[in-house]
C-alpha cells in the first residue's frame, strides 16, 4: 500500500463530520507491527469457517429497533470463511447486522484485531468495538469500564479515513477522547486489519499494522466484550445510503502476552 508521505501528517476532515473530530493523521512511523512482534500469542479467535454464526462465541446483539433501522438476524451471514453484516431495506425499514460476545467471551487487556472489508456507501457505518457491561453504572473507567471504538468507518469523512474513540461514564457526565481520525490511502478498498493494544496504562490503535494513536485516558481495568456492527442511519444520513451494502469480516483475533493471566 502506498503511504504517500503521510507519516505524521494531518488531513483536515470535511465539515459536518461526526461530533468533535481531530484532523486526520497518517501513521506515527513507518514501522509495521504485528501482535507477535509486540510479544503476544493467540488467545481467542473466530475465523468464521462454518456455515452459521458460532453460538458459543457470538450472539445477535440488540435485535430489534435501533436508530432509524432495525437489527435483524436476516442481515447476518456466515459463508465461505467470512462473516457478512448486511444493510438492506425491507418493508421500508433499513435492516442491519450486529453481533457481540457478551455472555460468551469477555476479557481485559491484550491485542484485539479484525480483518475486514468496509461498507461502500454512506449513512450506515461499519464498526469494531469493545464495551463494558457496567459502563452506565458509574464514572470511573477503571471500575466501570469503557467503550473502545477500535474502528468506525464514516464514509462522509473521506474514503481513506477511519475513526477511533474511547467513551466512558455513560450518562449526563459522559467523557470521551473525541474522534481520532487515521488516514491511510485505499483503506476503503479490499481487506484491511484494524487493531487496538489495550494495557493497564494505554490504548494503542493500529491500521494494517501501522501505529496511529496512543491514548492514556479512560483506561478500563475490567473485562469487556467484543462487538461487530453495521450501524443504521441517523435522520440526516438517510439520503446518503446506497443499499444493499455489506461489511465483511474475515476474522477476529485476541492475543495475550505470553504467560499473562486474563483474569488479572
Language model features with spans:
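Bacterial N-terminal signal peptides
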Residues: 7-15
Amino acid at each position: 500500500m502506498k503511504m504517500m508521505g503521510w507519516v505524521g501528517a494531518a488531513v483536515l476532515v470535511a465539515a459536518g463530520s461526526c461530533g468533535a473530530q481531530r484532523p486526520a493523521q497518517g501513521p506515527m512511523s513507518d514501522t509495521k507491527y504485528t501482535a507477535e512482534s509486540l510479544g503476544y500469542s493467540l488467545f481467542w479467535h473466530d475465523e468464521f469457517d462454518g456455515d452459521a454464526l458460532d453460538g458459543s462465541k457470538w450472539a445477535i446483539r440488540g435485535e430489534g429497533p435501533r436508530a432509524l433501522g432495525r437489527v435483524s438476524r436476516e442481515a447476518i451471514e456466515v459463508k465461505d470463511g467470512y462473516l457478512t453484516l448486511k444493510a438492506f431495506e425491507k418493508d421500508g425499514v433499513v435492516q442491519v447486522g450486529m453481533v457481540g460476545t457478551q455472555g460468551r467471551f469477555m476479557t481485559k487487556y491484550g491485542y484485539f484485531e479484525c480483518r475486514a472489508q468496509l461498507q461502500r456507501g454512506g449513512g450506515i457505518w461499519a464498526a469494531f468495538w469493545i464495551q463494558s457491561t457496567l459502563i452506565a453504572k458509574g464514572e470511573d473507567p477503571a471500575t466501570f469500564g469503557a467503550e473502545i471504538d477500535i474502528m468506525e468507518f464514516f464514509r462522509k469523512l473521506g474514503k481513506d479515513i477511519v475513526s477511533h474513540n474511547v467513551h466512558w461514564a455513560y450518562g449526563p457526565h459522559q467523557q470521551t477522547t473525541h474522534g481520532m481520525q487515521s488516514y491511510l490511502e485505499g483503506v476503503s478498498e479490499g481487506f484491511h486489519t484494524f487493531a487496538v493494544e489495550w494495557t493497564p496504562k494505554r490504548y494503542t490503535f493500529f491500521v494494517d499494522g501501522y501505529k496511529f494513536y496512543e491514548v492514556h485516558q479512560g483506561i478500563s481495568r475490567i473485562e469487556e466484550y467484543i462487538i461487530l456492527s453495521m450501524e443504521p442511519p441517523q435522520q440526516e444520513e438517510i439520503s446518503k445510503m446506497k443499499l444493499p451494502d455489506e461489511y465483511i469480516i474475515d476474522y477476529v483475533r485476541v492475543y495475550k502476552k505470553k504467560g499473562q493471566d486474563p483474569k488479572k
